[in-house]
Amino acid sequence: MFAPLLKKLFGSKNEREVKRMLKTVQIVNAFEEQMVALSDEQLRAKTEEFKARIAKGETLDQLLPEAFAVAREAGKRVMGMRHFDVQLIGGMTLHEGQIAEMRTGEGKTLVGTLAVYLNALSGKGVHVVTVNDYLARRDANWMRPLYEFLGLTVGIVTPFQPPEEKRAAYAADITYGTNNEYGFDYLRDNMAFSMDDKFQRELNFAVIDEVDSILIDEARTPLIISGQAEDSSKLYTEINRLIPKLEQHIEEVEGEVTKPGHFTVDEKTRQVELNEAGHQFIEEMLTEVGLLAEGESLYSAHNLGLLTHVYAGLRAHKLFNRNVEYIVADGQVLLVDEHTGRTMPGRRLSEGLHQAIEAKENLNIQAESQTLASTTFQNYFRLYNKLSGMTGTADTEAFEFHQIYNLAVMVIPPNKPLARKDFNDLVYLTAEEKYAAIVTDIKACIAENRPVLVGTATIETSEHMSNLLKQEGIDHKVLNAKFHEKEAEIIAQAGRPGALTIATNMAGRGTDILLGGNWEVEVANLEDPTPEQIAQIKADWQKRHQQVIEAGGLHVIASERHESRRIDNQLRGRAGRQGDTGSSRFYLSLEDSLMRIFASDRVKNFMKALGMQSGEAIEHRMVTNAIEKAQRKVEGRNFDIRKQLLEFDDVANEQRKVIYHMRNTLLAAENIGETIADFREEVLNNLISQHIPPQSLPEQWNVAGLEAALNTDFAVKLPVQQWLDEDDNLHEDSLREKIMAQLLVAYNEKEDQASAEALRSFEKQILLRVLDDLWKDHLSTMDHLRHGIHLRGYAQKNPKQEYKRESFTLFQELLDSIKRDTIRVLSHVQVRREDPEEEEARLRQEAEELASRMQFEHAPAPGIDQPLLDEEGGEAPVAVASEPVRNDQKLGRNELCWCGSGKKFKHCHGQIN
């Protein structure tokens, strides 16, 4: 009740932060005169001066005003652009590890240079993260002259880059790349066979462009490096022939089942579910074609894989539509990013779904894959010591940024006030009426020489709009995943008078639409343009620019609402950049996906009450509120899915960190002889305890079993029973010592046959191999556990607690297996004398061959095809995210282990250090 009054008296938190930063802005401005007086060499020398001051103990915060002044002056000299005061505030926001929300056209790329320059002075590296390779190259090459003028190096990481080139890019002061490439390189580094093969340094500071797209939209898609598994293409083809015979069961409408069938489709949760009739029908068909034995059930343990194939086929046919979720090009299924409309070449859906789509489209079916390494963007980006980001739309997701990443959102004031007019939504009864109204609006704008941008949610809609406009004889350009090669050219001219552009999800395109067109692109298209030609192009552009402004600026038309208000705001933001005039209007119908699934009943009843006729539209605040409520509902559900993904992946992430730490320690070690000796002792102790239980009577001892186990695990035949018969004083402990002594003799003989150096190298490579193979199998087991764990909710058990408990047990078994299998291999193998460098080179070559067979996948997020369950079946509590700026404290050996086992650290995960 007092909140509005307090806000009025003291201002909002955002306003108070802006006021605080304005004081620092004044200090930066005070340095400007001093910087202007410096020569280029003196200004460049400031970088080395700052580095020296940091070495003496000065902090980046203390350097900030002067460093920002240097970056601003360098921007003026090199690029002809001076940072505005509000851009300085944006730079401070990024440096403090926050998210800067800045409107389209406010110069986010230039803002980033301030925080990037300051943090690069530490020498620990800065990663600039973009949503695609084009923007990474464009921004790096655009800002490279500025950074190099200041004495800093710039690198770009791209897919399929030569290793040395990529290593050099990561070693640079500033590195540009995509979120996917950084994430996959992190996974690749943790599959390397040598420290020299790794790419990334310590993850120090990241500035994420379009941060909402990367940390929110893509958080549901785990990153997976996979290798090929067994070929089951024939099975997919057979299943694909059966799926069309299944009929969809239409749920009750006004008390009646309109169409009984075999399965239901839930569009809200994007799930398909076979009913009882469906299970019986599919079992009969599978039996007929010989895929299921007579009398067998699909739910038998050995048939669950077949059931997975059936569900993959159902999802491929009913949830994945051509030209919406994917396109077919060059005989391949290319996934379409639902948020940007771009294709994602090389990315494949996991769990057999991609193969099912290939079978549906009668394409060549590629082999299934097995996970070799995986992570999520949520957990990858939380590895950075400091994280920040910038976008035009973050405030609607401020709660999630804080909950998951502990990142605050700072709304940066615009340099010029917004002049765009946002009209109320127009809602029609049918899609046909809606499209007719859009065409009418387009004609009116073109008659006034206004440029128009039509935003669509799918490729299908963009092509439908294009066909309607062709019928009307209206000239236009189409920008979607099919024609993305022409993207830059289309965007450059989208602001010309009377230009009409249809775009699938403009979000993340990274290019501003300039009123009057882009004169710089026109100049770039000329070969050796003369000063006179450039002057003429500028003059022509100025006339067009003024003409468009007088006509009312860019008009944005949206053909439907997106699930996220943020994507809608991004589309609106294409008009009215930097104080330009402009307008936006959303056209909707009750047949739109969002309206049909979430908002149609309430709006339809309202429209009926008004007695609306065909062709009429409703424009009312109540309708807009109902739509926004529907969007908030979808956003809330998507947040729950992302939160659940994080909660489950946090369990795997702790295990991942332990394994990767173990691996890195192993790679860095010159000699792991002591580690192998510890493994041998532990494996032997466990083996003896299994056959000779502690404090047991000799009558309870299984000596024959122990002899057989020693032969299996250690490749030695020891007469244990004979020793016991010959020596009555031999007890459990002394027997243990005698066996260990014999094992050491056998192992030392192996060392004599080769050499100490060769055996040490071999131990390291064997442990790496065993660790990688078992970790790969563990990931597969964890996947199976996670995908079935939600069923525990029906047994009144908490799925998350069950997952944590069982995954901990699996991890304990993994650690034991690593030790046991390593010792078993080392005991059985015959080591010949081989140059360690040759052995390492051979292993590296094998690793490169493996890498060439790897696939990089986006898995369907857990939760999309499974219900969100906790112990009550309700909403789960939000996982509290760890701090993005952190200083890890080392756990004491006698403290309780972090994993929750209740054991001391030295007796649990401390054993592997």
Curated annotation (Swiss-Prot):
SUPFAM superfamilies: Helical scaffold and wing domains of SecA, P-loop containing nucleoside triphosphate hydrolases, Pre-protein crosslinking domain of SecA. Its EC number is 7.4.2.8. InterPro entries: Helicase_ATP-bd, Helicase_C-like, P-loop_NTPase, SEC_C_motif, SecA, SecA_DEAD, SecA_motor_DEAD, SecA_preprotein_X-link_dom. Its cofactor is Zn(2+). It holds the Pfam family SEC-C. Keywords: ATP-binding, Cell inner membrane, Cell membrane, Cytoplasm, Membrane, Metal-binding, Nucleotide-binding, Protein transport, Translocase, Translocation, Transport, Zinc. Coiled coil: none annotated. Part of the Sec protein translocase complex. Interacts with the SecYEG preprotein conducting channel. Has a central role in coupling the hydrolysis of ATP to the transfer of proteins into and across the cell membrane, serving both as a receptor for the preprotein-SecB complex and as an ATP-driven molecular motor driving the stepwise translocation of polypeptide chains across the membrane. Monomer and homodimer. Part of the essential Sec protein translocation apparatus which comprises SecA, SecYEG and auxiliary proteins SecDF-YajC and YidC. This is Protein translocase subunit SecA.
